[in-house]
Amino acid sequence: MIDIIEIIPKCSFSWEKLKEMKDQDIKFWAADGLNQLRIVGIDEKQKSFYMINQSGKITWPLRYENLEEVHDKIHHGTLTLLSYEIDRLIPTWGNYVSGLFKYFGCDKG
């Protein structure tokens, strides 16, 4: 008899997790390993968020919808978790988004 095994993603990415990261001041590294980041603002109405790096520079808002699209492509295998690949879909965000997804464990499966 063959057992059917459901594959569950190993990452914990979600809108709720992003809000939790902001509330708990959780820090993570950008993909280049040079910038430590954290989420400093959440806009529930626009469903977007802001990040701040270790030197105090705050990003412009990133819409969760864009992040979710990239996340799905990574897990479906149509996009690799590399900064320059992500930059094609979300210009200038590749380094930060890649680091965020690595924090969530998207590179583990």
Per-segment meaning from a language model:
Residues 1-109:
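Intrinsically disordered, charged low-complexity linkers and terminal tails
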